[in-house]
Amino acid sequence: MVTCVPASEQVGCAERDSQVYCEDTGGTEAVRVTDCGSPEDSGPQDEPSYCNSEDSGQLMASYEGKARGYQVPPFGWRICLAHEFAEKRRPFQANNISLSNLVKHLGMGLRYLKWWYRKTHVEKKTPFIDMLNSLPLRQIYGCPLGGIGGGTITRGWRGQFCRWQLNPGMYQHQTVIADQFIVCLRRDGRTVYQQVLSLELPNVLRSWNWGLCGYFAFYHALYPRAWTVYQLPGQNVTLTCRQVTPILPHDYQDSSLPVGVFVWDVENEGDETLDVSITFSMRNGLGGEDDAAGSLWNEPFRLEQGGTTVQGLLLHHPTPPNPYTMAVAARCTADTTVTHTTAFDPNGTGQQVWQDLLQDGQLDSPAGQSTPTQKGEGIAGAVCVSSKLLPRSRCCLEFSLAWDMPKIMFGAKSQVHYRRYTRFFGSDGDVAPALSHYALCHYADWEDRISAWQNPVLDDRTLPAWYKSALFNELYFLADGGTVWLEVPADSLPEGLGGSMRQLRSTLQDYGRFGYLEGQEYRMYNTYDVHFYASFALVMLWPKLELSLQYDMALATLKEDLTRRRYLMSGVVAPVKRRNVIPHDIGDPDDEPWLRVNAYLIHDTADWKDLNLKFVLQIYRDYYLTGDQGFLEDMWPVCLAVMESEMKFDKDQDGLIENGGYADQTYDAWVTTGPSAYCGGLWLAAVAVMVQMAVLCGAQDVQERFASILCRGREAYERLLWNGRYYNYDSSSHPQSRSIMSDQCAGQWFLRACGLGEGDTEVFPTLHVVRALQTIFELNVQAFAGGAMGAVNGMHPHGVPDRSSVQSDEVWVGVVYGLAATMIQEGLTWEGFRTAEGCYRTVWERLGLAFQTPEAYCQQQVFRSLAYMRPLSIWAMQLALQQQQHKKSRRPSVTQGTGLSTQPECGPKRSLANLNSE
């Protein structure tokens, strides 16, 4: 019999209304977190100096246990499972728009409503941005499982499987109750403790013992790994579940695998021998419509290779258009026993499974496959690993979760695509056992490689603990951004495609095609104005994927789609895509991306001022960091073409482009008129980069032409926009023209990242750049929300946020990280960390938006666009820090390991053009 402690007698769990096992362990103490102090306490300094303690603050205040878990690292995002976030925000909606801004967007709103109705009710499709059905606040998410491009499954910090992206780019935010871990402890042949390791109290599977006491458990995330520590009160047992996903920089094989591993370290701190088992239950599908078609079935499997045996269950889910097989598996060792239950009803009481475990801590392991389900019927299975545990000892129980969806179709269902991992495992849909076996045999090597990559940052005592968490945990989006990584068959690239791009075919065929969404709510692949910020993570960690993406973007640039459509903001009818301009995005996963680009329907982005410039800047940055001369030569004609397209925006021939009097750049609801700090700065930076590329490509006439433009443009930029403290937002007569834009130095940011922007290659006067950054810090950061929420996009000189648009008074997390990188580049290191810290603490510690970092939030009440691409720009901070550590005469280059090495013997610095001479 199992001993149950009534809720009224439980320590720290008095409010719960079901039986759970939370006996007082006696002498428990709360986790103490050393106070590192505030940067304000010590004042500005040249280098940050922070202590290396746990940085969990209030997130661990509810923890009543004393267990620290087995080999849980000191750095990361740590939260007690009983924690409740006090602040409950809501997504941005129309009623959050001021009356003046509502009037400005009335036409757009009416056109959007008409388009939304046709899309949802006539076409039966989901809008690429659904402004009427934003994702609600759910403060539950943790590290996703799965490598890059094979789909992801997110496990929440309380242990729930709650966010699914198996169909490419399409998300289902649904907690599946049957997907659980169960622990069973036996002493002297009797089960003394059996508990679902979940805080849930569901109305299904009611025979199971739910309602784990969260006060004795905590979660710790350091992506791509996570740890959950459970102290089992009264049992002298601590469980540490380590979740491992193969996110491996510079690896283009294992990083693509759709797998995750759960390693359970069970510590027996008592004086009695224990029999312990962990059971992993999993539903076939997600329930509801996902199961409605029926014909789902499970079967056991056993695979022995190379002296290692893995066994478990296959959950076959043949529903079109993207059928898949899920595998729940465990490693068999001399010290463990693996058993299973092939099928049970996830909507029933669960009594059969529960009683089976109670009897002997194992499952009955029936042979053969289950009967296929009827329409609407659910099915689940479970795998159990058990072992004997001596007093004062530890055992290790290993599970894997793999899913095999080799062939995919996007929403248009017009083409079949093969995921990257099929190159290594095959595409017949029968490799889930092999994936499971591979994961369980290789995860230790993955962890060694992850540690070798992360440790230089984690061991750096000059870096604050919050930054170490942010840098790695924000990388979740590279896998969980609706990401696809596809094979590119040879016959899909016609001979004439790409013209003179000699490396295009080999790059795409060797490294595949990569796509990630602008955001989980903004469903467009490779949104380029945002990738400008996020791309630092990709080029530093998987540079070949960045180059592949750039080749795809170059191909799309050279094409046109003259299909005419009405744009929602202006109401103007214009083509989908014009030749020789960078597309906004590569397409919608609910359509046919790469075939039909520019899913973005709000503006005609052919007239945007930033896209072409961002392409040129990224091409040079990617060349600079990779040293790939062939890539630069391939992209040079495309850069010439897009810059030629950009020339028409310099209407007065003063060397500086003008914005068009509407929101014609990444701030797509913030009107810009005439020469502007943001687009003008990007323009000058792109022109400067064209001068450098012309030298490298031996195009002297082009070099002279752009050098002349740069000379005139620099003078116009300073004359029209510099006011002595910062660069004006734009040069119009509008009241907001003197706003302080936090992103005004974006051009300088990229120049510095490319080893330019100072000395002979100076474009913006260094004193002006530093003064502008100081002004931004004083007003956009320190004068906004007490300096604790990052930098507001726009601020009036008298210290009031610019509310002239719906975006000017927002904080954009990815922009703030880029701003912080710029500050670090210019020697304002303390200010940079202080600025970025406000965003991290707001998102991860205050708002409860871990692993769903939004594009934006306001000072109060709202956030916008959860799980967004742009915050990957935090890797620009890391690049700036690493570049700081290198001598001026050396060039950073992406290599195996942490991201950069110095190779002074090669690279573009051999032939830099002097930008300060005619």
UniProtKB/Swiss-Prot annotation:
The keyword Membrane applies. Disruption phenotype: Homozygous knockout mice display an accumulation of glucosylceramides in testis, brain and liver. The accumulation of glucosylceramides in Sertoli cells alters sperm shape and males exhibit impaired fertility. Despite the bile acid glucosidase and transferase activities measured in vitro, bile acid metabolism is normal in knockout mice. No obvious neurological symptoms, organomegaly or lifespan alteration are observed. Cholesterol metabolism and protein glycosylation are also normal in these mice. Its main location: endoplasmic reticulum. Keywords: Cholesterol metabolism, Endoplasmic reticulum, Glycosidase, Glycosyltransferase, Golgi apparatus, Hydrolase, Lipid metabolism, Membrane, Phosphoprotein, Sphingolipid metabolism, Steroid metabolism, Sterol metabolism, Transferase. InterPro entries: 6-hairpin_glycosidase_sf, 6hp_glycosidase-like_sf, B_Glucosidase_GBA2-typ, GH116_catalytic, GH116_N, Non-lysos_glucosylceramidase. It is a peripheral membrane protein. The keyword Lipid metabolism applies. One of its GO terms (molecular function) is galactosylceramidase activity. Residues 892-904 have a biased composition (Polar residues). GO terms for biological process: carbohydrate metabolic process; central nervous system neuron development; cholesterol metabolic process; glucosylceramide catabolic process; glycoside catabolic process; lipid glycosylation; regulation of actin filament polymerization; regulation of membrane lipid distribution. Enzymatic activity is dependent on membrane association and requires the presence of lipids. Inhibited by N-(adamantanemethyloxypentyl)-deoxynojirimycin/AMP-DNM. Inhibited by its product sphingosine/N-acylsphing-4-enine in a feedback loop. Also inhibited by other non-acetylated sphingoid bases and their derivatives but not by sphingosine-1-phosphate and complex sphingolipids. Gene3D superfamilies: 1.50.10.10. Residues 886-918 are annotated as: Disordered. Optimum pH is between 6.0 and 7.0. Pathway: Lipid metabolism; sphingolipid metabolism; Steroid metabolism; cholesterol metabolism. The modification Phosphoserine is found at residue 893. Belongs to the non-lysosomal glucosylceramidase family. Non-lysosomal glucosylceramidase that catalyzes the hydrolysis of glucosylceramides/GlcCers (such as beta-D-glucosyl-(1<->1')-N-acylsphing-4-enine) to free glucose and ceramides (such as N-acylsphing-4-enine). GlcCers are membrane glycosphingolipids that have a wide intracellular distribution. They are the main precursors of more complex glycosphingolipids that play a role in cellular growth, differentiation, adhesion, signaling, cytoskeletal dynamics and membrane properties. This is Non-lysosomal glucosylceramidase.
